[in-house]
């Protein structure tokens, strides 16, 4: 039996085939253990089915056995895999243990190595510190020894110089004795040679040099002192003396004409020296319409025009109701004015008669004047007007009358056009030739000093400071101080600077300015370089600007080309080396005077070069306040200014009162004498201020009251406060007094002062009568002064409590109006910021806004606004182009930007600005900005970054203007300069040649731009050791510069010459006198120096005619005019006329002058050169021989000038094929050069070259090669000494020796 349950799986549903309900199969438990053997079924049919038995289907053992086998297999597989994993992990563990052991060993080794290196580092650091200490000690000892050796060397050189001078004096005495017929012993016949001392001075006459390695050069001061200070025509003070228009004119003539122009001269009125074009305007009621139109429409245009040239422009006028008031003020304004304008119709009111008489009839300085005369039908001019027009036209001859009939608008336009022409031509000195020719103006300033940037306003400020400091006519017993200063100049070198000390207001500036005037008068060969330091934190107290200005003043006396660094640190460091280099090129003393040197920012740090020994011909004088003098400077020789004694006090007060026609009573004098006995009341400024207050009060008649108030003031500040109260009392209204307070506060809050036109804009409601009256009173009481067109306070004082330097007047204003409250100062500075920001918003970027706005932001601590201001490209361009490089860097450092950040931000700003540029004018401005950025980056040392903006500037100019435009040459020149500094000489040479070609095509072959390119190419060839090519270019450049009719660095240039010529022309309108004839001659020379040859010829002819009438035809003065006329014709290449006049002048001077007179020598020289130029060699020979005789009589037979004359004569003989006669002359000249200048002097080398050519022509090739080789050795020696610089453009003949440099055939001598 069995069941069918084993045939189905558990849980399956079993269907009922009989229709019944199905059920689920389940496992029926077996309760009875089955038997081991079952009975076979008796009814089984068919074959047996496997597993169909009950045993096979229901057996548990079979089921579990299968499952067991399966699990067993799985377990076995699992076990084997896990065993494998365990074995693998064990292997990895073993491997990791081994790696761990290895790493631990390495770690221990590294730790040991680290400890070893750490110990070595500590020992190395300790050794480094010890080495640094030893180096510092060694450097200190080296500097000490170096300084001692320099002192020793300079002392010995001075002794040598004194011995040489004594030797020359003895030779001169010997020659005089021989001339008198006294037989004396001739040292030349003795066995001993008194000229045996060899003085080797390589390169002392070299004019051209660049900034080579300063550290490797010998002391140029010593080189200069070893050279004898020979006098002679070829030993000129500068290359301007050698040839060209200056050489053709007698040196005495042009020295007299030019010397006063190169120094500060008081011949010009304050208005011409001021930085303001002042128009004094007068009008009547009938012409008010024209005046209103002129002031509204045309005055702003003139203001923009003057701002472009760096000048202020203002129109001062008094309304008709004020004409009867302010008489003294109106007279003062007329005196200050640059031009007077009168608007008038048919009558002249009585209220204007005094002003017209003062402006037109008493116009002693010949100022330009304009009269607008409106003509109306049916009205005739009054008698007073007719008389004014007739008198002024006949006498002054400087008044232009504009007659107008018709519309007032047209009349105002006429007077505007006339005024514009007068301002440009007569006041600013701008020649108007082509209205469209404005391209050259952008770089005019840079041409004056090649690539050196400078600020014309800084120079003008110094000149005005000198004038104001020397204004006093009372010298207060300065003679004893003058003697001490003179002793300093005459003392043997080396000596430290002289310290002039004294209290504030003791007269230090006055003493220095008066002594400078005396030196200029009595020692014209002494170069005076002065700097007056003004208000602290002003431009004048910036050390880098001061040093650069002094350097440029030195450069006026040397035609050198310099690559001057604008980096302030390098500039201040290299200045002593530049001073040594330049001192040798000036044959005379150089005196540097710095007033108030203690006011310079970080003076002790930046003036360290004063401690080192100075070059032998350099003297330094500085003034300081006693309280603020640095301790290291107190060891210098000191000249202390004592307080005034009672005599000086009385003299000063009486002099000031006498000028105002005021006489003090005896009682008043006694009161003053008793009062002025203490140190503060005997101060020069204190006494001057008392005198000013008394004279100012004298007009009101209350001297006793003012004197009593003055006696209550015990110091200068209290006196200034009294002066402020006195001026306030005369102001007519409370509103005017408020204006006074605001004006003084604006001046106090500004950096360099405020101009009058700026005050009119800053103070709404302020009128010209009130402003001019206030300034007049404050100026009279020495509270205010003018400086470069700005109103400033006078006199400095140190306020120790604030540790800042201030004006005494500023201190008084601070106490009176601000009570030391910084918030009030900040308030007025904010008003100034708003004013200058308004100018920037109108695209008016002037030197004033660039200077003041950046400084005001710095003082206010507004860094973000300062940064925005610096990002104004035109503000930064203005600062950079005026040389304020150090100031610009300091501002960027203040806002936290480095050089790379600056460059990046400027690039981004330029790119943004370029997107808005359209039109030629905008593109030209963009090119200028790119060029400025390139130059700025070059000065920062970022040469690779500088190339991109310069290339962009070049592209813009070539596209917007023309590839041959002169400004393209400017871009090429600047880009080449960057390549030179980057040592890419091939690229630089190509660019320089392109710039040269463009400049020659645009300006001609004798323009200063051409000379600049030639100089740049010469420097480039010098760096490449192409010395012959470099020297050729330098000589060519030198000739161009000599022919240029201006002196480099003269601040006013032709404008000064033109104004001086106009003044002289006014002086020659009188009778025939010798003085007028001399003035005419001087006037002709001045026009000649301007290359205005036609006008010069007219005046020289007038001078000659007047001298012949007054003095006679054979007078030496007539020979002077004839000689100058001959020089003029020589310059015009009219050689026949020049020859005739030279012969006539020579005849007169031979009969009238001594045989060795310098004027005779000049005429002989120029006539001989003219003969040689015309090929009349036979006529030239006796003149050259005469030149030798004259120089022998003047300087002695062994003077270099004699050798030069011998060389000239020898060259002439060579040209005449008389080599036999030339040879001994060359040998004699070479012997003189070797004995006097040294065997390695360039003059010896030039003579050897000439002699080599002579031997070559004679066929003695071996001797010629020997001489030429020695000449080249001298040249190489000179080049190595001067840092690879070429020889001077001065030829050995002083300009008229035949050049043999290229006369030798190619391959004449082996290399």
From Swiss-Prot:
InterPro entries on file: NPHP3-like_N, NPHP3_ab_dom, NPHP3_hel, P-loop_NTPase, TPR-like_helical_dom_sf, TPR_NPHP3, TPR_rpt
Pfam families (alphabetical): NPHP3, NPHP3_hel, NPHP3_N, TPR_12, TPR_7, TPR_NPHP3
Protein name (Swiss-Prot/TrEMBL): Nephrocystin-3
Parts forming coiled coils: 81-183
Xref: PANTHER family: NEPHROCYSTIN-3 (PTHR45641:SF19), TETRATRICOPEPTIDE REPEAT PROTEIN (AFU_ORTHOLOGUE AFUA_6G03870) (PTHR45641)
GO biological process: cilium assembly; negative regulation of canonical Wnt signaling pathway; regulation of Wnt signaling pathway, planar cell polarity pathway; Wnt signaling pathway
Compartments it resides in: Cell projection, Cilium
